[in-house]
Every structure is written in structure tokens, then in C-alpha cells.
């Protein structure tokens, strides 16, 4: 795309995305405010608006007469900004402002204290100095490595921060890491980068303090709240490595995880694999000892995974959520338009759990006051795939709706969209389980 700038003074360039005009009206000249811009070249705005063509042009209340496009702080079509760590302007694949809000509007479950948002009134790190340009991926990566409480000051409008490297949690920087986006911040992997990584057994991230097996050490509690994750990718990350596969937005092995008032759009991981999963989130955990009770639960509260066509997450298994050995409490949330894209089931190619893939032994899945709809699994459990291998685990669906989750190659009779192996049949309480 070329832009020729004339008839302007000053600075503060801004790039706006606008709908393409008709061919007959494309004169190449735009009179905008005090400036006259000449522009040419088309771009295709990616997945957020399927098939729509857009033009980018530069505007300003004051601008240089022979300026160049800024590398960060790029407004999107509705005033949101894109912040990068340099390079040419590039709209991230997903425009989060086109996505649905966080949470299920009809969800009214009371949230226990353990599942509520954390206090961030005394942050350890504030990313940004009041402008989108000051909120960079590098600043975020460095803040996560430091630990503590992270907030953002990126200006009054929504901002998307595009990462060029994964933010990794260090296990020796305190027992809790809180990331609060203030309902304005989107973290984007740009379609190539996993966004967040935590692993208690990765030596490179320092083993957590204390004695005992790193797998069972409580480690760090990672809390993400009031924030959006888009276009994270864990494709090409092999299973069985320290940077274990799955979890396009968040990969958490060990430790604890809480997600409150968050959105996850178009996050992905590998298309094939027997256990690899979690387009949005993958959680790996282990029991302290056999019979000791379920593993530390993941809290997912008032959050949205997908939520409308074109925004769903995908992976071989667990299009949105995937876990081995972990339990979940999911409240007032929406999981829709997610896909388990693998195929072959037990042959090792996946395809299980369109929305949720939950595997382990003494595990518990509680879904309360939530909506799970329009998810797809090529094999089993288009809504939920729940397998307690020793049949000690349990699943409960309360005050919720599951619908339009089509049958793959197998499912549990009488439970459309489910495949369940547990100590007892799924506990369905005041819920609608619909085809």
C-alpha cells in the first residue's frame, strides 16, 4: 500500500480502516480535516470481517507534509489502536472490537471468593505512559517476567498489543501474577506467537520454591482479568518438550489459573495429536496423591471463547479449553464456534472436545449458568469431552444451556454433544441439553 502525503503541517499521524468505496468513486484523493491525502493500494482486512475489502488512509489534526506511516498506535475502524514493537503497519488478524462481550448475559451464578477478580489498586508494573505507542509487546513480556500485579495505561481507547515473543512466567517471582487489561487491552499473538506460558517444571523458568515434586508444587497463581486474547498460536510446538504443545493463548502446566471477564478469539494450536489441545487455554496438572481429591481447579468466570462466527478457537482437541489432570469451575461464560479439528480419535490424531476437552483421573468439571453452543468435534464430544480414566471423576452441568453441538462419530447416548466417562452419569441440574 502506498500513501503520498501533501498539504499538511505538524505530527500525530493516525491510520484509520474504512470500508472500500465503489470502484467508480475511487479517485485516490481524500479530504480529511485540515489535510488532503492521496492514497492508493488495497488491503484485505483479515478474519474479523470475512471477505470485506478495506482501505487504510492517514488522518491527523496536525501532520507532517512528507510523513511516513507510524509503526505503532494504529487505530482500527472503530477507534481502537494497534501497538507493535516496530516495523511496518500491519493490522492483526482479528479486530477484537468486532467480537462479542465477555460473559453470558443470562448467567447469574453467584461467584465464590476464589473465583472473583483480584484487587489491582497497587500495581507492581504499569505498562504504558498514556498512549498506545507506549504499550508494547516487549514491555508486556518484561512485566510478566518480573511478576506481581500488571496494569496498563495506554490511553482512553481500546488498544491491541501485538507480541513478537511469548510472555513467560517465572516461578520465583512471588506466588501470584495478576494481569488486568482494564477492559481496554487486547493481547495478540499475531497469528504466530503463543501469548502466555507458565510451567512449574520448566527449569528455564526456575523451579518454584519449596520441597517436593515440581508437578505438585502450588507454584504461581496466574490471574488474567478484564482482557482479550486474540490470534495466539501454539502450532508447531511439540508435545513432551518444556514448551509443551497446546494452548494458543495460555499454556499453564502446574501452578494455578484464574480467568475472569476475559475474551478469547481465534487462538489455535496443532491440528493433529492424540492429546494436544486447547486452542485458547491448555492446563496440565496432577494429583498430589491417589485419592487426595481433585486437582486445583481452574476458574473461568464471565468469559467468552469464540462467541460468534469467525471468532472461534481451534485445535486438534479442545477447541477452546483442554486439560490433563485438571479440574474446572466455569461460571457465567460462553463457549461457542470452537472446533476440535483433529480426526482419528484413538489413532492419535485427536478430534475430541469441540469446546472442552477434560482428561485425567480424579478430575471435576462444573459448568454453571453458562452457554455452550455451535461447537464442532470431528470425533467425540462436540460440546464436552470428559474422560476420567479410572472413573473417579465427575461432571455437573447446572443452570446452563448446550445446543447446536452436532454429533461427531460418537457421543454418550442421551447427551447430545457430550462424551462422558466418569464415576457416575453427568449430573444435569436445571439445564437444557439440546441437539
Task: Describe the function of each predicted region.
Residues 127-151:
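Acidic Gly/Asp/Thr-rich repetitive segments characteristic of extracellular carbohydrate-active
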Residues 189-193, 233-240, 268-276, 309-318, ...:
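Short glycine/acidic-rich loop motifs that flank beta-strands on beta-rich extracellular proteins
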Residues 50-61:
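Bacterial N-terminal signal peptides
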Residues 141, 145-146, 162-178, 186-225, ...:
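Extracellular beta-strand-rich solenoid/capping regions of secreted or surface-exposed proteins
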Residues 39-52:
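Bacterial N-terminal signal peptides that target proteins for export
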Residues 148, 159, 167, 175-177, ...:
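The right-handed parallel beta-helix/beta-solenoid scaffold, focusing on the short coil/turn
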Residues 181-184, 219-233, 256-270, 287-311, ...:
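Right-handed parallel beta-helix
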Residues 31, 35-40, 60-91:
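Ser/Thr-rich, Pro/Gly/Ala-heavy low-complexity intrinsically disordered linkers and tails
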Amino acid at each position: 500500500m502506498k500513501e503520498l502525503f501533501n498539504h499538511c503541517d505538524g505530527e500525530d499521524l493516525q491510520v484509520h480502516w474504512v470500508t472500500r468505496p465503489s470502484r467508480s468513486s475511487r479517485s485516490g484523493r481524500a479530504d480529511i480535516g485540515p489535510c488532503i491525502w492521496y492514497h492508493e493500494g488495497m488491503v484485505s482486512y483479515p478474519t474479523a470481517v470475512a471477505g470485506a475489502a478495506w482501505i487504510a488512509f492517514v488522518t491527523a489534526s496536525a501532520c507532517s507534509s512528507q510523513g511516513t506511516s507510524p509503526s505503532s498506535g494504529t487505530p482500527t475502524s472503530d477507534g481502537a489502536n494497534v501497538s507493535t514493537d516496530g516495523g511496518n503497519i500491519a493490522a492483526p488478524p482479528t479486530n477484537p472490537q468486532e467480537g462479542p462481550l465477555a460473559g453470558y448475559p443470562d448467567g447469574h451464578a453467584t461467584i465464590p471468593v476464589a473465583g472473583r477478580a483480584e484487587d489491582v489498586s497497587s500495581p507492581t508494573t504499569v505498562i504504558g505512559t498514556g498512549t498506545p505507542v507506549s504499550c508494547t509487546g516487549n514491555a508486556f513480556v518484561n512485566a510478566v517476567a518480573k511478576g506481581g500485579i500488571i496494569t496498563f495505561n495506554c490511553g482512553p481507547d481500546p488498544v491491541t498489543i501485538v507480541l513478537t515473543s511469548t510472555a513467560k512466567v517465572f516461578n520465583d517471582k512471588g506466588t501470584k501474577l495478576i494481569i488486568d487489561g482494564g477492559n481496554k487491552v487486547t493481547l495478540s499473538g499475531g497469528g504466530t506467537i503463543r501469548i502466555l506460558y507458565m510451567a512449574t517444571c520448566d527449569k528455564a523458568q526456575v523451579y518454584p520454591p519449596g520441597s517436593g515434586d515440581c508437578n505438585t508444587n502450588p507454584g504461581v497463581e496466574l490471574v488474567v482479568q478484564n482482557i482479550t486474547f486474540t490470534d495466539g498460536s501454539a502450532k508447531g510446538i511439540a508435545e513432551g518438550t518444556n514448551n509443551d504443545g497446546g494452548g494458543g493463548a495460555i499454556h499453564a502446566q502446574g501452578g494455578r489459573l484464574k480467568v475472569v471477564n476475559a475474551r478469547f478469539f481465534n487462538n489455535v494450536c496443532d491440528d493433529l495429536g492424540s492429546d494436544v489441545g486447547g486452542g485458547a487455554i491448555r492446563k496440565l496438572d496432577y494429583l498430589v496423591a491417589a485419592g487426595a481429591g481433585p486437582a486445583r481447579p481452574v476458574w473461568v468466570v464471565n468469559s467468552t471463547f469464540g462467541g460468534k462466527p469467525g471468532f472461534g478457537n481451534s485445535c486438534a482437541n479442545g477447541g477452546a479449553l483442554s486439560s490433563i489432570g485438571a479440574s474446572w469451575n466455569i461460571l457465567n461464560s460462553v463457549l461457542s464456534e470452537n472446533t476440535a479439528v483433529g480426526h482419528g480419535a484413538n489413532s492419535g490424531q485427536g478430534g475430541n472436545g469441540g469446546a472442552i476437552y477434560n482428561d485425567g483421573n480424579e478430575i471435576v468439571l462444573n459448568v454453571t449458568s453458562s452457554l455452550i453452543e455451535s461447537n464442532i468435534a470431528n470425533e467425540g464430544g462436540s460440546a464436552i469431552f470428559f474422560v476420567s480414566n479410572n472413573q473417579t471423576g465427575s461432571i455437573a452441568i447446572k443452570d446452563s444451556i448446550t445446543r447446536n453441538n452436532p454429533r461427531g462419530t460418537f457421543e454418550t447416548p442421551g447427551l447430545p454433544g457430550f462424551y462422558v466417562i466418569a464415576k457416575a452419569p453427568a449430573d444435569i441440574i436445571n439445564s437444557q441439553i439440546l441437539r
